[in-house]
């Protein structure tokens, strides 16, 4: 729920170690007046004595819930990502990337202390795919803008019993596509002094979690996805 929590280290806790392997191809080329760069990368990571948390009870004095950090058997994280950049000077620049990966424990681990909840090999809060893009342009001498986006694929998130659900459940979250817009205009005051006025919208698509827990016994850890709903902002910047 929303109560405080204490994390203790298990006796004989070993350090988590990893071995990683990766390979990539990086290609720079021109498309007419545009310069481009393409990067393709593959990766594989083996984690040994991987850390995980397990509930062990409550502190008798404060009533604080206690979780213990323990060693699991291991985990594997592997996948591939692609990044692409294309630019035409300062007039227009585009950068985008996408990653596909698998994050799995070698043996299933319990994410809840409830014995009726099945353990899982899938790492929680780790999407199997995610990506981004950023487009910036300065079509006028004193005006520029940018459009960016972040894609987060579905992930597994534990939802503990409380005001939201009566029994613990592992939730496959929805996918999110967060879009952002920023506009800026420069007002030259003198040769060495410029006043910039800017504004924009964060999370233009309002891609945001819709099922927050409420009340005193909420699961305060049941939070996922973009950190803010649709938000507007404006600012002034002095450049000299």
Pin down the residues of each PLM region.
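Gram-negative outer-membrane beta-barrel transporters
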Residues: 37-47, 64-161
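Residues on the lipid-exposed face of transmembrane beta-strands in outer-membrane beta-barrel proteins
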Residues: 13, 23-27, 80-86, 96, ...
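Membrane-embedded beta-barrel scaffold of Gram-negative outer-membrane proteins
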Residues: 12-70, 76, 197
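Outer-membrane beta-barrel translocator domains and adjoining extracellular loop/strand segments
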Residues: 1-3, 50-58, 101, 105-115, ...
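C-terminal beta-signal and adjacent terminal beta-strands/loops
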Residues: 48-49, 150-160, 185-240
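Residues that define the transmembrane beta-barrel architecture of outer-membrane proteins
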Residues: 17-21, 74-78, 125-131, 175-179, ...
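Surface-exposed loop/turn segments flanking beta-strands in extracellular/periplasmic regions
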Residues: 1-8, 55-70, 115-118, 217-223
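Short loop/turn motifs that connect adjacent beta-strands in outer-membrane beta-barrel proteins
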Residues: 30-36, 89-91, 142, 188-195
């Amino acid at each position: 729920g929303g109560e405080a929590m204490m994390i203790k280290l298990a006796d004989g806790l070993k350090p988590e170690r990893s071995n990683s392997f990766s390979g990539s191809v990086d290609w720079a080329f021109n498309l007419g007046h545009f310069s481009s760069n393409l990067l393709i990368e593959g990766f594989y990571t083996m984690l040994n004595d991987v850390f995980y948390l397990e509930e062990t009870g409550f502190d008798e004095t404060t009533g604080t819930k206690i979780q213990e950090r323990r060693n699991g058997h291991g985990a594997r994280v592997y996948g591939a990502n692609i990044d692409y950049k294309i630019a035409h000077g300062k007039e227009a620049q585009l950068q985008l990337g996408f990653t596909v990966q698998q994050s799995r424990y070698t043996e299933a681990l319990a994410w809840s202390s409830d014995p009726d909840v099945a353990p899982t090999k899938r790492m929680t809060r780790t999407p199997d795919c995610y990506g981004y893009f950023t487009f910036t342009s300065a079509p006028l001498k004193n005006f520029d803008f940018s459009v960016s986006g972040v894609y987060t694929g579905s992930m597994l998130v534990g939802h503990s019993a409380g005001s939201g659900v009566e029994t613990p459940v592992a939730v496959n979250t929805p996918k999110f596509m967060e879009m952002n817009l920023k506009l800026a205009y420069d007002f030259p005051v003198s040769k060495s002094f410029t006043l910039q006025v800017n504004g924009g919208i964060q999370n233009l698509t309002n891609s945001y979690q819709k099922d927050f827990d409420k009340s005193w016994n909420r699961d305060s850890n049941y939070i996922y996805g973009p950190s803010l709903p649709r938000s507007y902002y404006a600012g002034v910047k002095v450049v000299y």
